[in-house]
């Protein structure tokens, strides 16, 4: 037999860590801003602006493509091969651009990152019998994958080998 297969799809990743409300402005109740004390000598703390909001934020996305086949020859030799190509985009990053400290807030998360991942998996298996009571098989598996960060919003580095992009 010979079986051919292929698939294509768009998936999303909502596993974004602890900052669930990146679309909303946050304010932090902190002792960094001292407003004074009460008559009973209790400290009055203030609010500090946190990371800037991004109302256009969305989940990370990935386009996935896979093509492959499997076959059996002579009832004893199984061969399978798969090629895959995945492209992730809109990966959440904090932009490397600096904003003046007098703004008093950090840059927001943005959907800027891009990666690609491609490779293959292959398998060859021979199975047979010796008489009626002994069965054996030999199998060889192999794979190769190549991952590349296409964009990661990194700061300017002094040497090229410091960059994770590329």
Where are the language model's segments positioned?
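Extracellular/periplasmic, surface-exposed regions of secreted and cell-surface proteins
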Residues: 1-166
């Amino acid at each position: 037999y010979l079986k051919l297969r292929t698939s294509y799809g768009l998936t999303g990743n909502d596993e974004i860590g602890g900052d669930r409300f990146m679309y909303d402005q946050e304010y932090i109740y902190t002792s960094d801003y001292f407003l004074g004390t009460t008559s009973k000598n209790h400290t009055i703390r203030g609010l500090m602006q946190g990371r800037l909001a991004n109302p256009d934020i969305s989940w990370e996305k990935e386009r996935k493509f896979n093509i492959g086949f499997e076959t059996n020859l002579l009832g004893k030799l199984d061969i399978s091969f798969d090629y895959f190509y995945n492209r992730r985009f809109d990966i959440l990053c904090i932009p490397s651009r600096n904003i003046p400290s007098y703004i008093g807030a950090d840059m927001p998360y943005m959907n800027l990152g891009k990666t690609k991942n491609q490779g293959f998996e292959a398998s060859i298996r021979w199975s047979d019998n010796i008489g009626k009571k002994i069965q054996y098989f030999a199998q060889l598996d192999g794979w190769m994958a190549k991952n590349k960060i296409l964009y990661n919003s990194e700061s300017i580095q002094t040497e090229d080998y410091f960059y994770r992009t590329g």
